[in-house]
Amino acid sequence: MSPGQGQKGNPNDPRSEASKKKDLIARGDYTPTPAGKAAFFILRGIEPVLQYSILAHGLGTSVLHRVGLRTLPPGLPTHTGVPLIDGLGLSPYRLVLLGMAVGAAVKQNIWVTALSGEPMPVTGAIAVGVFNAVFNSLSTYAFLSTATSASIKGDFPQPALLIGSSLYVVGIMTELIAEVQRKRFKMNPDNKGKAYTGGLWSFARHINYGGYTLWRAGYAMAGGSYTLGALVGAFFAWDFSQRAIPILNEYCEKRYGAQWEEFKQKTPYQLIPYIY
C-alpha cells in the first residue's frame, strides 16, 4: 500500500475518492504503522551517506564523465579542530551541502516519529526515501558538474551558496516550527475537531508547504546555482498549488466547515505570506 491508498471507506475523510487518490497522506486515519515508520526513519537516516559518497568519493561521476561532462576537483578539506567534521575530508562548500542533506533527514525523521499520526506504509516510506535521494543527488551532482556548479561563480562563500543557505534555514525551520505548533494544539483534548489557525499558520494556511518549497529551492540553489534553485522551487510551488493544497482544502472545508471559511477570510495567503 502506498500513501493515499487504503483511504476508501475511511469515515474520517469526507472527500471524493478522486481527491483521496491524489493525496499522499491518509487524512483522519491514525492506524499505527510501526514497520513503515521504521523503514522511513532508516531510509532517511542513511540517505546522507549517499550524498557523502558522492561528495567525498565521486560516486556516480563516471557517468557524467562518460557523457562529456567535467567535474570539480575535491578542494582543500575543512579544518575546524573538530575531529568528527575534519575527518570527513570535505571542502567547506561540500560540507555545507552534506549538512543540508543531514538537516533534511533529521527534520523529516522528527516529523515521522513525533509529529505525524497518519499511517506510513512501507511502500510509502520507500517512495519518500527514493524521492529525497533523487532530489538531493540532483543538487549534489549539479554542484560537482563544472557546467552547472554554483561553486565556480566566485570565491567562497559564493552568493548562490549564501542565498541558498538562507532559504534552506528559513524554510526548514518554518516547516518544523509550524508542524510543532500544530501538533501541540492537536494534543490538547479541548481542541478536538478544531482547525489550528494560530502561530505561523496565521501567515499562510499551508505555511509548512511554503517552508518546504523554500528549503528545497535553497538546497538546489546552493548546488546548482540560481537556475536549478528556480526550477526546483517552481516545481514544488506548482505541485502544492495545483495538487496538494486543493485536495487538502477540500478536506478542511468538509471537516471544519465554518471554521475553515473564517480562516480563509482572515488568512488569504495559502503557501508563502504576502506572495501566494
Residue ranges and their predicted role:
Residues 60, 65-153, 163-167:
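Intramembrane catalytic core of multi-pass membrane enzymes that act on lipidic substrates
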